Amino acid sequence: MQLNKDILLVSIISLFSGVLLGYFQAKCFKRSTITKNKEEVEQIKEIENNNQKEKEKEEKEGDDDDDDDDESESIDGDYDENDDYEIEYDEEIGDCKQVLVIRTDLGMTKGKIIAQCCHASLGARQKALKDSKKVLRQWENFGCAKITLKANSKEELVDLRNKAKELGVVSYLVLDSGHTQIPSGSATVLAVGPAPKEAVDAVTKHLKLY
């Protein structure tokens, strides 16, 4: 009889011990979960804050780059702020154009000719930017008219350039570096203008279309 009572007592103690142990384990697990969740939330917040800082930094750097671009344009001297590409036709200047005179005796490929024409056109534009800003603006605002003509020799290109200089017309003669198809120093394309049409025609009117 006494043995049964002892067994019952041990069973009751074991039961309560199990209940208490389970309770404390649950409490500890809950606390651990809360702590873990709190840490995860803090980590997420920290990541979001870092991402926000990176985004703000990138935006600031982007703004700085834009400022640098504006400054570069100003240094290049494209136009004054007051010019600001106003679309207003200047009757005194009239219609403007640029002629590209291509030398035909060199046997240049189409790709080579295109590249040389680009060099000539941009070179003449840079000269006009310095010496004929109003004419350049008129030309750029109203179509950037370009015509390709042909010459048969270096001497013809040089004569045309000299005539343009005499008349005060912007011109630019391209001398090739000789890295590809033709000898170094070869005169390839002459740009005449941008300038008023009459001034350009005074130099190139006798030439044939390319």
Swiss-Prot record:
Residues 40-81 are annotated as: Disordered. It catalyses: an N-acyl-L-alpha-aminoacyl-tRNA + H2O = an N-acyl-L-amino acid + a tRNA + H(+). Belongs to the PTH2 family. Transmembrane segments: none annotated. It comes from Dictyostelium discoideum (Social amoeba). SUPFAM superfamilies: Peptidyl-tRNA hydrolase II. Pfam families: PTH2 (PF01981). The keyword Hydrolase applies. Residues 40-60 have a biased composition (Basic and acidic residues). The natural substrate for this enzyme may be peptidyl-tRNAs which drop off the ribosome during protein synthesis. This is Probable peptidyl-tRNA hydrolase 2. The lineage of its organism: Eukaryota, Amoebozoa, Evosea, Eumycetozoa, Dictyostelia. Signal peptide: none annotated. Keywords: Hydrolase. Residues 61-81 have a biased composition (Acidic residues). GO terms for cellular component: cytosol. Its EC number is 3.1.1.29. GO terms for molecular function: peptidyl-tRNA hydrolase activity.
